[in-house]
């Protein structure tokens, strides 16, 4: 168990870089959980036992049973059978009406006032005829223990008699079924855990749970009780009842100062009453892992203030045995399944449980990185089922990384928000070469490294696009603070005054934010003029506008003076090639 969990801890450290407070909280909880072998430290709620109550319950099987007997006996204030007449108003209180109580089996809400058993009387879950002694108002022990008693309709109590509970496949309402009595779907788990308690707390009195029909001080049917234990998990009423029986705050006059371990830790029941080879493995994904560990890496990109839709995952169970499991989600995450009172039933391999993972609005309130997780822990404590089974089943974790970005912002300027760029390509002469000028798109989002990348697409072009053009190609994932460089050009093929408008649409990176609308449109407005022009570049001397001997003389003088004005090839050297280039230009003449 520890080797597997230590490996998981290393993975946890590697994945979580201490960049978010909830990471540290989750990690602390994880470390505490590793401190014991069987004891599990749960998140606190109002019905939880004191942190140290089960601290010595670290074994399995008979050892664990003895440890639980000791825990439930230490400081136990035994109450009498007569005390239940008053204490029921506290621990069996109707949550919707404080002056009434809920009866076992039929769930009737009746006045809590004791009227000598006319409205309700005291049901021994473990029949008094199947345990030593007989009940009187002064009787203590299991006969007077409120964990082993329930308020009941008198006629229902009488009809049940001392029948054991059984018929594992029964469903629906309560009632006799031949040799056995069925407590009903609502109470079958509660009844099972009450009997588990009695057989542990009062084991020294000879109370024993058996399969089939019991005799003497025995009670059963254990197989049915165990199956019901996983089908009907501890609910709010049962947990409140357990805590109210124990609590000085809730029950100052009749508190027992002891608890039912099988309500607080339902995962203990299998090891105590079945065997040490629970075969369950829980996992996410399609294939059962050998060691039971499964992980999902969930990487999400979101914009500040956006809503992240819930996501569904399937938790699978392999093995025929039943098991309880715990689901914890980091702060900021919600889960449709949570806490430690979740169970997979017995004799049902291949079943699964959908888990919906939700995301609180706080995650996207600010730009930055959120790290959290949803962890599933198979709570079974047995270790002999093999690798990946029971307590050897390593936790299953959905790692959640959310990178929250400020929206991207496109601009033609790297220092300010410029949505329209007017680019004048000037005036050129016909046939003297195209004009060109560079321009860039910038991403100037807020948020630094958490400014969203942008995509830029050309959506329309109007005007003289045959003359004024751009070499633009679609921009994908332009990081914040980066630029994409392009150029605009004007053709020298025809004369005139030209203008063209190119409209570009800017999106937050569509590979990260596929459902987000566009951010804005940018416009590139191009203009320029192509003139018929004068003489060629060989027109070096007055009178300008004509080519004659004076232009030839001017060139020769410049060449002789080694003046680079005669460098018609623009290579920084005066030679024959410049003379040839001049003569070619001279040959072009004037229009």
Regions found by a protein language model. Give the residues of each.
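N-terminal module-boundary/linker segments of secreted carbohydrate-active enzymes
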Residues: 41-107
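Short, His- and charge-rich active-site/binding loops that engage polyanionic ligands
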Residues: 101-112, 117-119
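N-terminal secretory signal peptides that target proteins for export/translocation
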Residues: 1-22
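Feature for long, exposed domains in two main contexts
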Residues: 275-535
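Domain-level detector of nuclease and nuclease-like folds
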Residues: 115-276
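Cellulosome-associated attachment modules in secreted, modular CAZymes
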Residues: 530-591
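Bacterial N-terminal signal peptides
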Residues: 25-38
